[in-house]
């Protein structure tokens, strides 16, 4: 009886760009040896929209609605970096109340982004129940955003020198209620997920990257901190009012998919702590624009003093960026989001270079998945947290 001959050729398959677990229009060309992944090549560009070139023919206020389409699940961060770059280049002072409001919005956006990461990530590995619980809390954050900004996702809220409008009456109390509501729900997620033997069997030891490799690849955010690197730009760069708040950097030494999950869960808890403190310490004063009140009151207006006239003044729509260059970065939910800005005494930037965290984090994917099973590729990709809007720009 003759033995059946098996084919030793490798198989090349396409995943995406419309596969449900691709998190957007990502395409992966995967080389398989049986069920084992031999190679994986990400193919980008399906969502490229010339975001950097568009910036060169727009004022900052005109460009703000565009930037919410980079990482469309954490739009407060793309707005923050867009106004921080010209503010630091031109030395614009931001009132304390506006800085506190910004931090509250940024941390709410971080929680919303991590929640929307956790739901699809669990669905990718076959657990659909947590998805529905997680979206329940995410909707509450979007309700807070809608009350403050008028928009649920694309907020267009940040401005050079502050924010667009002050917080509405009763908003602070609603935000406090949410901060009391969320921690027990995070405990509920952990009871459902963290020690679930099926979950741990799917993610433990999977997609490992060590400390040195994480640094050498230029990883940032939860991808870097899950590999044992205690590095958070909110502590390193001292921007906004993070130094005035008591909080800890969430990090882990596991370096695998489970560690990245643990770091993001810890970050949600720390964000709640920060929001609570910022709400309690929220100062009075201008949020951005006292110019209208000063003009309506005439030359004897109480708003006519030096501080209010200049520090609390709304920037002009034709705000000119001085000649010079500057790199600004913030700690976004997915890592270091940066902008390299070159100004030339014009209302338009001469160069606007975006440093998206997802693009750099995606580069390490072939290394993470090499030698794993095809079914594990989705879990590893989900743990990286890719949003193609910011990858392709």
From Swiss-Prot:
GO biological process, one term: photosynthesis, light reaction
Principal subcellular localization: membrane
Transmembrane segments: none
Membrane topology, as annotated: Peripheral membrane protein
Pfam families (UniProt xref): Complex1_49kDa
Catalytic activity as recorded in UniProt: a plastoquinone + NADH + (n+1) H(+)(in) = a plastoquinol + NAD(+) + n H(+)(out); a plastoquinone + NADPH + (n+1) H(+)(in) = a plastoquinol + NADP(+) + n H(+)(out)
SUPFAM superfamilies linked: HydB/Nqo4-like
Alphabetized Gene3D superfamilies for the sequence: Cytochrome-c3 Hydrogenase, chain B
Enzyme class: translocase
Enzyme Commission number(s) from the entry: 7.1.1.-
GO cellular component: plasma membrane
Location(s), subcellular: Cell inner membrane
Record-level Gene Ontology MF annotations: NAD binding; oxidoreductase activity, acting on NAD(P)H, quinone or similar compound as acceptor; quinone binding
The UniProt record lists the keyword NAD: yes
Keywords: Cell inner membrane, Cell membrane, Membrane, NAD, NADP, Plastoquinone, Quinone, Translocase, Transport
Top-level taxon: Bacteria
Protein family membership: Belongs to the complex I 49 kDa subunit family.
Assembly mode: NDH-1 can be composed of about 15 different subunits; different subcomplexes with different compositions have been identified which probably have different functions.
Functional description taken from the UniProt entry: NDH-1 shuttles electrons from an unknown electron donor, via FMN and iron-sulfur (Fe-S) centers, to quinones in the respiratory and/or the photosynthetic chain. The immediate electron acceptor for the enzyme in this species is believed to be plastoquinone. Couples the redox reaction to proton translocation, and thus conserves the redox energy in a proton gradient. Cyanobacterial NDH-1 also plays a role in inorganic carbon-concentration.
NCBIfam families: NuoD, PRK06075.1, PRK07415.1
Protein name as annotated: NAD(P)H-quinone oxidoreductase subunit H 1
Biological source species: Gloeobacter violaceus (strain ATCC 29082 / PCC 7421)
